[in-house]
Amino acid sequence: MNDATQPHPLKNFPVSWEELHRHSKALAWRLLELGPWSGIVAVTRGGLVPAAIVARELDMRLVDTLCVASYDHQTQGRIKVLKGIAGDGEGLLIIDDLVDTGDTARVVREMLPKAHFATVYAKPAGRPLVDTFVTEVSQDTWILFPWDIEPQFAPPLASARR
């Protein structure tokens, strides 16, 4: 079964802004002693916020983007590189929010084989492709990042009885 035909995950794992900040800071702690890094590369769009937090915590100012498109809502499709990075990645720290099936990570690894690849969250299928991660979630879990959800009105429980 390929990624485009995979069934939707069975579980949702909502992540708040506070949790994402805490987990991204924990990632920075793990990366602190592994440097020094010449720069950070955020894999867009999911890696932008974690990369900003890691850059702050590691006191790094050089942040670039690797623009990759693979998801359309909850369906992973063909991977398109919209903006690459020159070189082999030596000295670079790549940051993404999540490694899922590993398809995006494989493309990134091919482009920047000497970079250190770090994600906040990792699923089992993609975990071997990253060097550092903070939180593992099961393959059948869909992570709901705070930029993908919004609060909305929920009627009181008692109103359902009327």
Predicted regions and their residues:
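PRPP-associated nucleotide enzymes
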Residues: 1-162
